[in-house]
Amino acid sequence: MALLPVGIRFIISFSRDQWYRAFIFMLTFLLYASFHLSRKPISIVKGELHKQCTAGDGPESPFSDPSSSTRHGPTHWLLNNETDCGWAPFDKNNYQQLLGALDYAFLCAYAIGMYLSGIIGERLPIRYYLTFGMLASGAFTALFGLGYFYNIHSLGFYVVTQIINGLVQTTGWPSVVTCLSNWFGKGRRGLIMGIWNSHTSVGNILGSLIAGYWVSTCWGLSFIVPGAIVAAMGIVCFLFLIEHPKDVKCSSTLPTHPRASENGINRFRLQKQTTYSEKNGPLDPELQCLLLSDGKNPLHPSHIVVLPADGNMAAISFTGALRIPGVIEFSLCLLFAKLVSYTFLFWLPLYITSVDHLDAKKAGELSTLFDVGGIFGGILAGVISDRLEKRASTCGLMLLLAAPTLYVFSSVSRMGLEATIAMLLLSGALVSGPYALITTAVSADLGTHKSLKGNSHALSTVTAIIDGTGSVGAALGPLLAGLISPSGWSNVFYMLMFADACALLFLVRLIHKELSCPGPAAGIQAPLKEH
């Protein structure tokens, strides 16, 4: 018998289940990368919506008033319907506040919508829900770009478009995280989701390059092309997304070690012993360790989420999800971590334009290095948290290093492109690492927490609560940057450093619990002890 071709031998070396999981991994990666691809153009186009006046109109500093040169009549209008100093109404002296309003409109709507999205998503098929969101997102992203071709200069048009786009984009994150968690168990979740979460940076990079290609010649296409890509991926989602392994008769991935307990904050290998609560019977020992309030007494039994035992897993309530240990702390931590990340997402190209005096296209391309650093930061955070089996401690370490790094960034970025490039990579890794870990592995761990008694229906709500709270910070960050930047970019960096410190503060209790509770790092199966 002739030997099978190498390619065929490679294909059959993997099981049917493994091929399906690889397919879902890549599909959800591309689906959410397209969401981020559509969010990036606004930050690239800012430099074109408001730009320095031509030499004939006189010099302009980054914070000077260019509006006087754009109100003298049609002689100052170019063939592409924009003025020498930008696109009305963003050519005025308060352009930073107006551009900040666009960010705030999108992110505030996103934050509010996210709380509702998880609840709605648990009650609808993921494939239909996500398809609708992607088609609508593509339409409203493209609608923003149509303002260029139809010569629209109404601030209200752009703000309303951003609000609706922010609402429909909330369908994405809870859906893809829930789908991926259905297919992948808890083993090496930090590494798997750390790699998978690089879709954020990949989407940002592609969005920057696509938007940058047209920004100086026809900025409307910087929105229309990404919008078309998101809509096309929505059709792909409808045709190919498989919500759960059981839908194609695949097995669900189970934890490798049946005696090892995992909770998303830490993973413990404990001697098999049982504790009891008054009403609920056996309580998982790792859950008891997590619930210890002062090292001696467990918290009130109400902190345990009780679900029906008849096998009919109803969707968890909002308050029930909040009672899962660690949800509130990680949500508040993400609020400040995402504030920092989204400030860079929306304002970094404009900062580079101001400091390094580059045009919008080159600044957009250079800003992608922050996302390149974010890819490595997310993977590194996942690997470290899997190795140490301490999610909160990993986030805390990176947040601790991020604050002084931002200070150095603000100091050396004015020294030339080489210094800016180095600090973009380092800052991207440290800023994006905790953000990536919390929104993926931590959210998935908490959404499948032992206290839920196996109810996977909680995952979408938990993910939405954590990311929704983080999105409040994402809305505040760009808004504050727009208000603070006229007083100097250094003050913006001080604000970001303060936010990192606040994010770390909310993890102190969980870090203390991780370091005080026994774990497998000790190399033995230790009994649960009172501390």
From Swiss-Prot:
Gene Ontology MF terms in the entry: glucose 6-phosphate:phosphate antiporter activity
Location of the protein in the cell: Endoplasmic reticulum membrane
GO cellular component: endoplasmic reticulum membrane
Record has Endoplasmic reticulum as a keyword: yes
Disordered as annotated region, ranges: 53-72
Membrane topology per record: Multi-pass membrane protein
Protein name: Glucose-6-phosphate exchanger SLC37A1
Annotated source species: Mus musculus
Gene encoding the protein: Slc37a1
